[in-house]
């Protein structure tokens, strides 16, 4: 994100910030696992909010852009261990949300984990700090907003993008459903269809 911003907002010859800044429209397209039984494999999810469990964004001044009420609700409902750092919640670009939304896409609250195994509740040999965390996230509800999916990018993209003045939106093709234990029969097809859907929406 910093590199993309530097391409348009930093004079690379003088290494100084430009006087007139450019705001980018950034759409992330990726894959994710659903946390809810009614969001099936091969469906699409638009992240209205990104929940950062990675602590990365806490290195920046995010108080003015974070959704503190949702953060507090998540901490309380999951009995979050603050030794892991304070979770952060950042909203998506409302402009891009309006351009991409339709009845073909779910909207929701996306968890951003700091790793693939333990941070997402997976166990091989190492025990994890809270074996019940995934179940707690599945049942999280804040004024009707549920946690829909879990991946590793959205929270940071939303936070850095908003701090830098860019419009960001994260979209996911669901290739696994943790609630039902099912998997996509053709994840590449699901991603291709999401790419086509998004490009058509942006072009119109």
Where does each model-flagged region fall?
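Metabolite-binding pocket within alpha/beta catalytic cores that recognizes anionic/polar moieties
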Residues: 1-88
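Short glycine-aspartate micro-motif
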Residues: 24-28, 149, 168
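Glycine-rich beta-alpha junction loops
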Residues: 33, 50, 111-118, 156, ...
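Polyanion-binding loop/helix "lid" in catalytic or ligand-binding cores
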Residues: 87-91, 149-154
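Zn-dependent metallopeptidase/amidohydrolase metal-coordination segment
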Residues: 155-187
């Amino acid at each position: 994100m910093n590199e993309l911003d530097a391409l348009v907002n930093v004079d690379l010859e003088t290494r100084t910030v430009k006087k007139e800044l450019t705001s980018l429209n950034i759409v992330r397209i990726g894959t994710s696992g659903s946390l809810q039984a009614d969001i099936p494999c091969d469906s699409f999810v638009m992240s209205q909010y990104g929940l950062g469990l990675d602590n990365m964004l806490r290195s920046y001044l995010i108080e003015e852009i974070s959704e503190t009420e949702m953060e507090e609700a998540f901490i309380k409902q999951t009995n979050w261990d603050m030794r892991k750092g304070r979770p952060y919640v950042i909203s998506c670009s409302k402009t891009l949300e309006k351009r991409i939304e339709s009845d073909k896409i779910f909207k929701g609250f996306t968890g951003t984990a700091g790793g693939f195994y333990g941070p997402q509740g997976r166990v091989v040999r190492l025990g994890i700090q809270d074996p019940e965390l995934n179940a707690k996230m599945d049942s999280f509800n804040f004024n009707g907003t549920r946690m829909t999916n879990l991946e590793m990018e959205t929270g940071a993209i939303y936070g850095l993008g908003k701090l830098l003045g860019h419009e960001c939106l994260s979209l996911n093709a669901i290739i696994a459903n943790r609630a039902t234990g099912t998997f996509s029969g053709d994840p590449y097809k699901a991603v291709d269809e999401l790419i086509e859907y998004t490009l058509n929406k942006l072009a119109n």
